[in-house]
Amino acid sequence: MMMLMTSITISFLLPMIVMLLATTLSKKSINDREKSSPFECGFDPKLNMPFSIQFFLIAVIFLIFDVEIALILPIVIIMKTSNIMVWTLSTMLFIIILLVGLYYEWNQGALKWAN
């Protein structure tokens, strides 16, 4: 039992000591402003540019509809093995949900690029 406790203690302490040594030895002693800033081919860095929320919303909507289209693709393969009535109803329900979501986004103005 004592051997087990010793090996567990060593297995926890040894990596902690190694990580502590690596952290302290790898620190830079001099913080240079030019070396800390991003390199942008001689141009002034544009880190504080405002990001368009409208562009972000369009990207998220595209991502959502892209995933939904990827979910539609296997429906054609399922058609051969399932009941045609169940397949038709489930496909129509899925497409109606897509269209309702598109209408909602359109109605809320999320698809308008400019005011």
UniProtKB/Swiss-Prot annotation:
Cleavable signal peptide: none
Annotated GO CC locations: mitochondrial membrane; NADH dehydrogenase complex
Superkingdom of this protein's organism: Eukaryota
InterPro entries reported in the protein's UniProt record: NADH_UbQ/plastoQ_OxRdtase_su3, NDAH_ubi_oxred_su3_sf
Subcellular location: Mitochondrion membrane
Membrane-spanning parts: 1-21, 58-78, 84-104
Main localisation: mitochondrion
Membrane topology: Multi-pass membrane protein
Keywords on record: Electron transport, Membrane, Mitochondrion, NAD, Respiratory chain, Translocase, Transmembrane, Transmembrane helix, Transport, Ubiquinone
Gene Ontology molecular-function annotations: NADH dehydrogenase (ubiquinone) activity
Reactions listed under catalytic activity: a ubiquinone + NADH + 5 H(+)(in) = a ubiquinol + NAD(+) + 4 H(+)(out)
Enzyme Commission number(s) from the entry: 7.1.1.2
Job of this protein: Core subunit of the mitochondrial membrane respiratory chain NADH dehydrogenase (Complex I) that is believed to belong to the minimal assembly required for catalysis. Complex I functions in the transfer of electrons from NADH to the respiratory chain. The immediate electron acceptor for the enzyme is believed to be ubiquinone.
Family: Belongs to the complex I subunit 3 family.
Name of the protein in its database record: NADH-ubiquinone oxidoreductase chain 3
Organism of this sequence: Locusta migratoria
Organism lineage string: Eukaryota, Metazoa, Ecdysozoa, Arthropoda, Hexapoda
